[in-house]
Swiss-Prot record:
Main function: Guanine nucleotide-binding proteins (G proteins) are involved as modulators or transducers in various transmembrane signaling systems.
Record Pfam families: G-gamma
Domain G protein gamma, residue spans: 20-93
Self-association state and partner proteins as the record states: G proteins are composed of 3 units, alpha, beta and gamma. Interacts with the beta subunit RGB1.
Protein name: Guanine nucleotide-binding protein subunit gamma 1
Residues bearing the modification Cysteine methyl ester: 90
Organism: Oryza sativa subsp. indica
Coiled coil: 12-52
One GO term of the biological process aspect: G protein-coupled receptor signaling pathway
């Protein structure tokens, strides 16, 4: 027992602290329930996405040209590395 009647104030603070913790736990439980609901929907979306990916990958991209090699052989020299690195004067190599 505390002198001066301070025991009631301590009980009130303890009660509010417990209520705040309980409210926080309820919010976390609600958040986890919403997450579980979203995960249940994800299976349906995942199957639809897989089907879309198979369809998209089976068709060629209409914006990209279909080539089996370089369009111009002389352009290859610009994209190849140097044949002899000792004689190369490039700063980035």
């Amino acid at each position: 027992m505390q002198a001066g009647g301070g025991g009631d104030a301590g009980d009130t603070r303890g009660r509010h602290r417990i209520q705040a913790e309980l409210k926080k736990l309820e919010q976390e439980a609600r958040f986890l329930e919403e997450e579980l609901e979203e995960l249940d929907k994800t299976d349906k979306v995942s199957a639809a996405l897989q089907e879309l990916m198979v369809t998209a990958e089976s068709k060629a991209d209409p914006l990209l040209p279909v080539t089996t090699g370089p369009a111009c052989q002389s352009w290859d020299r610009w994209f190849e590395g140097p044949q002899d690195l000792r004689r190369c004067k490039c700063w980035f190599l």
